[in-house]
Amino acid sequence: MILVDTSVWLDHLHAAEGRLVALLGDDEVGSHPLVLDELALGSLKDRDVVLSSLGSLRSFPTITHDELLALVDGHRLWGRGLSAVDAHLLGSVALVAGGVLWTRDKRLMAAAADIGIASMA
């Protein structure tokens, strides 16, 4: 399953991303509550439809505060310009066997690659 980050969704909502459309059709895409939260805070065309559609995708698990701190320490994620949301997404994907993260954020992509969960979708 692929967790699609907010950066990819925003680009897709402005101009259809063919690869994402195909992955959605193959039921390979999952979501995360914090990605939905970030999108909900933005200005979206057809906001209710978009949020409802993304909310209906399979959801990646969330991690606890203690799990987040263990991830940050275990993978030395501090000082890399990541946000708390970024760290939560990394931890959530790491919990899913075969899970990968698709992002356009360079720092988040580098951290995902270091952990072994980066998607080149």
Residues of each region from the PLM?
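Active-site neighborhoods of divalent-metal-dependent phosphate/nucleic-acid chemistry enzymes
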Residues: 12, 18, 59-121
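Short, well-structured N-terminal submotif of metal-dependent ribonuclease cores
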Residues: 1-35, 40-52, 58, 118
